């Protein structure tokens, strides 16, 4: 929700092309896209990428939401031995926590955190700097889709949806939480105490 896919498939791809990389040497797969469902099987993904590689020049493989591939660690490890392939991946849920990735690929990759927009970035983007902008940022945060949305109801709806379908679901899956109501109540209590003294 912070723009990882846009950063990878648009900005980085355009950068590579400007550097002289041929488009057929950039292999991108959005694994969240239903059209690519068959590529979520590790062997199918390996075969698809391998069929597009040759020995001429450097290749750049971009896999978005790689945690949707079962045994994705094995898939990524398969490309480590190929000298003319660089692999870039994104992931965004409990199955793809950075500490797990660091453990699995220690010394064989770099990690880049993509965070929501800072207030300065929002202020630079918009030309209506005011106290209202500060209040709005403090209330709704800096997720790009929220910043771009003008309708308050749509902002709230989007944030509620993210909380329920992204964060809470990931916590439930990762830690096998069975009492949904207890988790929701805990989150409500913690959210109401932000910035306040707790005992």
Task: List each model region and its residues.
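Conserved P-loop NTPase "ATPase switch" module shared by AAA+ and STAND
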Residues: 54-72
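Hydrophobic positions on the alpha1 helix immediately C-terminal to the Walker A/P-loop
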Residues: 7-11
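Conserved glycine(s) of the Walker
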Residues: 3-4
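Short glycine-rich substrate-engagement loop in P-loop NTPases that contacts/grips substrate
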Residues: 27-59
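Post-Walker A helix-loop "phosphate-sensing" segment adjacent to the P-loop in P-loop NTPases
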Residues: 13-25
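Interdomain hinge/linker elements that couple catalytic modules in large macromolecular machines
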Residues: 119-199
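Structural recognition of the conserved hydrophobic beta-strand(s) that form the central parallel beta-sheet
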Residues: 62, 86-92, 113
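Short regulatory helix/loop adjacent to the ATP-binding pocket of P-loop NTPases
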Residues: 78, 95-111, 125-127
């Amino acid at each position: 929700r912070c723009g990882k896919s846009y950063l990878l498939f648009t900005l980085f791809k355009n950068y590579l092309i400007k550097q002289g990389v041929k488009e057929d040497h950039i292999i991108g797969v959005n694994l969240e896209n239903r059209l690519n469902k068959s590529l979520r099987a590790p062997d199918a993904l390996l075969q698809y990428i391998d069929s597009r590689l040759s020995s001429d020049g450097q290749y750049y493989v971009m896999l978005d939401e790689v945690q949707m591939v079962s045994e994705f660690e094995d898939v990524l490890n398969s490309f480590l031995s190929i000298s003319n392939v660089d692999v870039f991946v994104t992931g965004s849920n409990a199955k793809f926590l950075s500490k797990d990735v660091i453990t699995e690929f220690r010394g064989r990759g770099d990690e880049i955190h993509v965070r929501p927009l800072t207030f300065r970035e929002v202020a630079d983007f918009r030309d209506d700097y005011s106290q209202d902008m500060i209040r709005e940022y403090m209330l709704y945060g800096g997720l790009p889709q929220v910043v771009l949305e003008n309708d308050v109801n749509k902002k709230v709806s989007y944030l509620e949806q993210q909380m329920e379908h992204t964060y809470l679901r990931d916590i439930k899956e990762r830690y096998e939480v069975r009492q949904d109501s207890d988790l929701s109540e805990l989150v409500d209590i913690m959210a109401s105490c932000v910035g306040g003294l707790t005992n």
